[in-house]
Design a protein with these regions (language model features):
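A charged, aromatic-enriched C-terminal amphipathic alpha-helix characteristic of glycosyltransferases
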Residues: 149-157, 167-198
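Acidic donor-binding loop of glycosyltransferase active sites
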Residues: 75-93, 103-107
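Short hydrophobic beta-strand element within catalytic cores of glycosyltransferases
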Residues: 107-110, 125-126
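Short beta-strand segments
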Residues: 24-31, 62-65, 110
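Nucleotide-activated donor-binding/catalytic signature segment of Leloir-type glycosyltransferases, i.e.
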Residues: 32-79, 83-84
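A conserved mid-protein helix/loop that constitutes part of the nucleotide-sugar donor-binding site
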Residues: 1-14
Length: 200
């Protein structure tokens, strides 16, 4: 699971279990295809993870499965009940969804590794971790290079960050707004056109 959704879910549940006031987690995901069978597989995995967490009161997790239009994604990023964006991804080429999320003026929490660090500055919440060998079963047959590594966030640190953002939200909003302004300017259509013209 290149996005490390399993450990994101487990960390979230462990962090906020048995609390009277809890945030919820919205998972925008799909497996191989946006089919009913795939959705059921995603929900089954979610139930398996929930079953590993000991707690009487677990926070809600909402699953948005399949493809959304650009307008629907924009509505999700900017919905007033969505307070932050989080990813435990093991690695990205560029990480466009994280760039889009950064434009929402809400805190973005992501690993301090891979393509997205090109646009997630110190105004984002970058999680420490370590490079680890990619497990054989994570790749399709005959597609794995032995030396392949990916990044794994420090889950204990991530848990503390999630809790602090939930309890002290206002201290993160100024940086989130700064990140949005920088990225709107740096990655606008005009700015990207100019960069491409310089390359060509």
């Amino acid at each position: 699971d290149r996005k490390d959704l399993g450990m994101l879910i487990k960390t979230f549940l462990e962090t906020f279990k048995n609390q009277r006031k809890q945030p919820a987690l919205i998972l925008k995901t799909s497996g191989a295809t946006p089919s009913i069978l795939d959705r059921e597989e995603v929900l089954s995995k979610l139930r398996q993870i929930r079953d590993t967490v000991n707690g009487k009161l677990l926070p809600n997790i909402y699953v948005l499965h399949g493809d959304l239009s650009d307008d629907e994604m924009n509505g999700l990023y900017n919905h007033p009940k969505v307070k932050a964006h989080v990813s435990f991804t093991h690695g990205e080429g560029f990480g466009r969804p994280l760039l889009e999320a950064s434009l929402s003026e809400k805190p973005v929490i992501a690993p301090n590794w891979s393509g997205h660090v090109d646009f997630l500055s110190s105004n984002a919440i970058l999680l420490p971790g370590s490079l680890n060998e990619v497990k054989k079963e994570s790749f399709p047959k005959n597609m794995r290079v032995k030396e392949s590594q990916w990044f794994t966030v420090n889950y204990n640190y991530a848990s503390k960050v999630l809790k602090d953002i939930f309890n002290n939200y206002s201290k993160y909003t100024v940086k989130a707004k700064k990140l949005s302004i920088v990225n709107q300017t740096k990655f606008s259509l005009d700015a990207m056109t100019k960069k491409f013209e310089e390359i060509l």
